Regions:
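Aromatic- and glycine-rich beta-strand/loop motifs that create alpha-glucan
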Residues: 1-8, 20-31
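Acidic/aromatic-lined carbohydrate-recognition and catalytic surfaces
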Residues: 4-12, 33-224
């Protein structure tokens, strides 16, 4: 065991391994021949791993690609324009994804995760780790536009009005269906309420849930 004294500031470290003239390094990337300090291990003083997480079987879920439990909340083709193209609803889950796949949506949602809780428990899963679930125009949702609400495309769409974009139209001020879906308070509050029940069901089963919080940056669609 190695004892590393810590103060109040985070510290970073890596291992340097020497065998004769051969030098390599061990860090978050594994063993490398080149030193890359940005991938050093880190220690945050005062942080304590909760006991329930130690040794727990965790299952990470990229929600859009897991299971479609509610087709009524699927992102629609031409619902809005994002980065390099219009949003696209993908029907064939077995097709090879596009290289630029960020605006392709397969319809996976939180209802799909709920529907598969028995399956996950049968696998021995104790903790579900969800990739970001808050309002965002991408399928990965690391570019959040509203931290206060679960994205209705993952939750509940109870109010659904407005037009889709024409094939030639890249102006999202015309994306009335998208705007209604992700800003209408009925949809936002219904999605949050559904998520609360979802978490209760997970806890009732003796399982835990971890959310991926992305707080060091937001997306270009942000509400601020």
């Amino acid at each position: 065991a190695i004892q590393i004294p810590v103060g109040s500031e985070p510290i970073h470290y890596y291992f340097e391994i020497r065998a004769g003239k051969i030098v390599c390094y061990y860090n978050e990337l594994g063993v490398t021949r080149q030193l890359q300090e940005q991938y050093s291990f880190g220690i945050i003083p005062g942080f304590h791993t909760p006991d329930w997480a130690k040794g727990a079987v965790m299952y990470q879920i990229f929600v859009d690609r897991f299971y479609n439990g509610d087709s009524s909340n699927d992102v629609l083709t031409n619902e809005y324009f994002y980065i390099s193209g219009h949003s696209r609803r993908i029907e064939d889950w077995s097709k090879i994804p596009d290289n630029m796949d960020v605006n392709n949506f397969y319809g996976g949602d939180l209802q799909g995760v709920m529907d598969k809780l028995d399956y996950l428990q049968d696998l021995g899963v104790e903790v579900i780790y969800l990739n970001p679930i808050f309002v965002s125009p991408s399928n990965h949702k690391y570019d959040i536009q509203d931290y206060d609400y679960v994205d209705p495309h993952f939750g509940k769409i109870v109010h659904d009005e407005g037009n889709l974009l024409a094939d030639w139209d890249k102006d999202n001020t015309h994306a009335k269906r998208y705007i209604d879906r992700v800003t209408n308070k009925e949809n936002l509050e219904a999605s949050n309420a559904w998520f609360i029940d979802f978490v209760k069901e997970i806890h009732k089963r003796g399982m835990r849930i971890i959310l991926d919080g992305v707080f060091n940056h937001c997306g270009s669609f942000h509400k601020w």
